Amino acid sequence: MEFLDGSWKKEVSSWDALMGEELLNQEAILEGAIHSIRNMGDVAFVIIRRREGLFQTVLVNEDVDFSIHDLKEGMTVRVKGVVNKEERAPHGRELHIREIQVLSSPAEPLPLAIDKWKLNTSLEAKLNYRSLSLRNIQERARFKIQEALTRAFRDYLYENGFTEIHTPKIGARGAEGGANLFKLSYFHKPAVLAQSPQFYKQMMVGVFDRVFETGPVFRAEKHNTKRHLNEYTSLDFEMGYIDSFEEIMAMETGFLQYAMKLLKEDYAKELEILKVELPDASRIPAVRFDVAKELVAKKYNRQIRNPFDLEPEEEALIGQYFKEEYNADFVFVTHYPSKKRPFYAMDDPEDTRFTLSFD
């Protein structure tokens, strides 16, 4: 009988070991997928794709008993060779191949050139071959940024005494009303997909004081614009025993600062790949809803048409205004009108036409 203790010794070299000094001029084993092959005749550069990134290997014909023509992009392989320092290679290391074991091979040539820096193909082609297009460096980087944001959200809220919860995504009714609900039959009873975990969060605040969730929400949006999504990952938190709604704004500001710091420190490679310049969250201005409307109307000679909500153009102009005037990348808009806020938004006791809420 065998008992497992949670440890497993692998002969494959770790990424950290490949990057370190200990394996220089030593034999190492690398596993991954062949991302690209550059055949120079007697020498070929075989780029191996791993979860950490791309690693350059070098195949010299006279050093091996097989041909470069035996290798294909998309193969998964186990490579044995000697690690050398090479400043021109990605990460300053390369592995000189001595042996290659093919673990799997594509049945036919890849329909997408995933080794290119950017996938120059249609959205339809990307989705039709999604399991392949996701292997492109830029496509992978987007998922790492998503990981960074959810990781930062969890870590920051854990550090601030929050409890993570997991709420149902099928319910009898929506949390925010309206017609943008995905309706379905739940064992012959009407049901909807969750728009928001709002009511569950409020329920659990009575249990744990501070709760959060990262999970999918669904909106049956009938508009095909960049402002509308039918499904997305929502980062939600709820906290009790607050002195002011501004305490929530402070918590959100702290999270944004934490997330930007994590992205800079642990995801610099992905930011570079995507050519992303991080916004500044060090100081975020807050402006009342009615004041924001007046500022935009005056600055950009724009008439206020809807006194109860922000039009898309107004939202863009508010961002533009605070960038121009204060070099701010974020802005809080507070005190939305009671008429446009859900019933659980607290009225401002000094003027019940407005709420103690923000976006």
Residue ranges and their predicted role:
Residues 163, 266, 299-303:
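Short coil/loop linkers at secondary-structure junctions
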Residues 269-282, 286:
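Short, highly charged C-terminal tails/helix-capping segments
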Residues 2-242:
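Class II aminoacyl-tRNA synthetase-like tRNA-binding/catalytic domains
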Residues 164-166, 271-273, 333:
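Cytochrome P450 heme-thiolate monooxygenase catalytic core
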Residues 258-271:
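Flexible helix-coil linker/hinge segments at domain or subdomain boundaries
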Residues 180-261, 282-359:
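A translation/RNA-centric and nucleic-acid-associated enzymatic feature enriched
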